[in-house]
Amino acid sequence: MSTFDKHDLSGIVGKHLVYTYDNGWNYELYIKNASTIDYRIHSGMVGNRWVKNQHVYVVRLAQDVYKVSWTEPTGTDVSLAANLADKIFHGTIFFPRWVMNNPEKTVCFQNDHLEEMAKFREAGPAYPTEVIDEFATLTVIRDVGENNESVIDCPPDQLPANFPENLKN
């Protein structure tokens, strides 16, 4: 009988992850608790976007392997898999057509623009959906504890010039 506990999220909750997709996009994710994340997008189509208190679903797939999934107010769906032991990350992002057509509309601190994001989403168009399916390399994995509001507390362009190297000290 297996002793694997698929409900044990202690290996991912409280982790701050920085990763670079194979396409060059840089992201940052903080697993704030078992149902909430904060994140920053450093580069790529929606670079300089950041979000706090995004509701998510977190599951444990295997030892040191977790999946985090959510739907954003923009209508974008995201599913991420993190293999912490091998520092391998995989993300699938389902962008509605309106985001692909006008990504700059989402480049903001989303929490201050929730009504606006909902209006954009409702106006659409939603289809055809653009699927971004990419592997990434985890460059920083650090334990910062649960519900730490200081982990992601400013836009990417206000971080130290040596980010994320400054985290490795």
PLM features: what roles do these ranges have?
Residues 54-74:
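Compact, well-ordered interaction domains used in eukaryotic information-processing assemblies
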Residues 23, 31-36, 62, 85:
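Residue-level recognition of beta-strand termini and adjacent short loop/turns
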Residues 1-25, 169:
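Tryptophan-anchored aromatic micro-motifs
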Residues 69-169:
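Beta-sheet ligand-binding and adhesion/scaffold domains
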Residues 11-18, 34-38, 62-69:
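Short, hydrophobic/aromatic-rich segments at coil-to-beta transitions
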Residues 23-27, 49-54, 74-80, 88-90:
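Short, surface-exposed coil-to-beta transition loops
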Residues 22, 40-42, 71, 94:
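Surface loops and adjacent helix of pleckstrin homology
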Residues 28-59:
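N-terminal glycine/threonine-rich, aromatic-flanked beta-hairpin/loop signature
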